[in-house]
Amino acid sequence: MEPDDFDSEDKEILSWDINDVKLPQNVKKTDWFQEWPDSYAKHIYSSEDKNAQRHLSSWAMRNTNNHNSRILKKSCLGVVVCGRDCLAEEGRKIYLRPAICDKARQKQQRKRCPNCDGPLKLIPCRGHGGFPVTNFWRHDGRFIFFQSKGEHDHPKPETKLEAEARRAMKKVNTAPSSVSLSLKGSTETRSLPGETQSQGSLPLTWSFQEGVQLPGSYSGHLIANTPQQNSLNDCFSFSKSYGLGGITDLTDQTSTVDPMKLYEKRKLSSSRTYSSGDLLPPSASGVYSDHGDLQAWSKNAALGRNHLADNCYSNYPFPLTSWPCSFSPSQNSSEPFYQQLPLEPPAAKTGCPPLWPNPAGNLYEEKVHVDFNSYVQSPAYHSPQEDPFLFTYASHPHQQYSLPSKSSKWDFEEEMTYLGLDHCNNDMLLNLCPLR
């Protein structure tokens, strides 16, 4: 369409300049986005055009300073060509996009041609009176105005999509060599069929239930099952042997004996005695937290209900009531008598009297070494003072209860059920005399 065919309104739209104070707003039809604008072109795009919003152009353009903040100014960088003027396989020449940054562009010129490995050179744009072609962008109302000044005097460079595709193909071509190198390295590190890996390179996971005994010369990494191990150490830290008159460390036995066999052995050795699962309140941390829970345990025990049979400590492989911590010594002196010992020193507790006076003298009394440096803190429980069977201090022998005789009608299990024993009363068991 010739300019003479336009009316006055259309001529006003075509005669605008990007630097005008007021741009035309009575635009009836916007232009399609142009990828290669050239030769002093003018375009009016919709403000909703994504490409216009991003100020895209297939020419290699970079932002330049402009005194007018409302106008975005971009100048052309030219094109990078091969110094040997080589041709690609498709029969076309190599036209690369110049880098936007000045330092990157200088570095790019020192690289080699991707096709013939020849030198690269930059052809600058001088299409606007000896200066680069300049593009102007301006957002005004519902439209985006574009104006190009100058005519490009160099070939079109490759588009951004073509440049990305070329880089991807280059990575694909170099990938097989890198994969072969990685496979070669993996075969070198792979052990031979006759070789065995050392213990130092194999991490081990050890728990108490597995019963694993590590060699003394082992120096590898050990990943311990700390929650379960700590809880088991609370129950099996110490044991007292009345028959042998010494101290037996259960942790040494559990390292060589299967836990199930150890459990059955302890259960067999305590079959002739009274099990503490029905007599003693729980001593593990977290089972009873206050005085009210202890009273509830005493009431349940009075009704013949085992409260611990339903609530098992999650870190124990067996319920707490199933560990046979007995009161009386074994009839066979060759079998070790295991007894639950406190984790705190008896001297630090003022309200810890002996269970009954020892009329037979120091028959089974002996000093037991207790590790006071244990990191597990045992909760302190206070026995209810209204308990009619609460024992008093050892300094008042006239207030202590005597041991019931064999002819007494009270059953020993029923009698001990009413006792509110806690960690404090567990210390009395060290000086326990024979009950029968």
Curated annotation (Swiss-Prot):
Pfam family, one: GCM
UniProt: Zn(2+) 1 binding residues: C76, C125, H152, H154
Source taxon at top rank: Eukaryota
GO annotation terms (biological process): anatomical structure morphogenesis; astrocyte fate commitment; branching involved in labyrinthine layer morphogenesis; cell differentiation involved in embryonic placenta development; gliogenesis; positive regulation of DNA-templated transcription; positive regulation of syncytium formation by plasma membrane fusion; positive regulation of transcription by RNA polymerase II
Disordered: annotated segments: 171-202
Post-translational modification: Polyubiquitinated in the presence of UBE2D2 and FBXW2 (in vitro).
SUPFAM superfamilies, A to Z: GCM domain
Tissue expression from the record: Highly expressed in the placenta. Expressed in trophoblast cells of the villi.
Location of the DNA-binding region in this protein: 14-169
Binding site for Zn(2+) 2: C82, C86, C113, C116
Main location: nucleus
Compositionally skewed regions (Polar residues) per UniProt: 174-202
Transit peptide found in the keyword field: no
Keywords: Developmental protein, DNA-binding, Metal-binding, Nucleus, Transcription, Transcription regulation, Ubl conjugation, Zinc
One GO cellular component term noted in the UniProt record for this chain: transcription regulator complex
InterPro entries on file: GCM, GCM_dom_sf, GCM_large, GCM_small, Tscrpt_reg_GCM
Compartments (UniProt record): Nucleus
Molecular function per GO: DNA binding; DNA-binding transcription activator activity, RNA polymerase II-specific; DNA-binding transcription factor activity; DNA-binding transcription factor activity, RNA polymerase II-specific; histone deacetylase binding; RNA polymerase II cis-regulatory region sequence-specific DNA binding; sequence-specific double-stranded DNA binding; zinc ion binding
Function: Transcription factor involved in the control of expression of placental growth factor (PGF) and other placenta-specific genes. Binds to the trophoblast-specific element 2 (TSE2) of the aromatase gene enhancer. Binds to the SYDE1 promoter. Has a central role in mediating the differentiation of trophoblast cells along both the villous and extravillous pathways in placental development.
Protein name, entry field: Chorion-specific transcription factor GCMa
Organism listed in the record: Homo sapiens (Human)
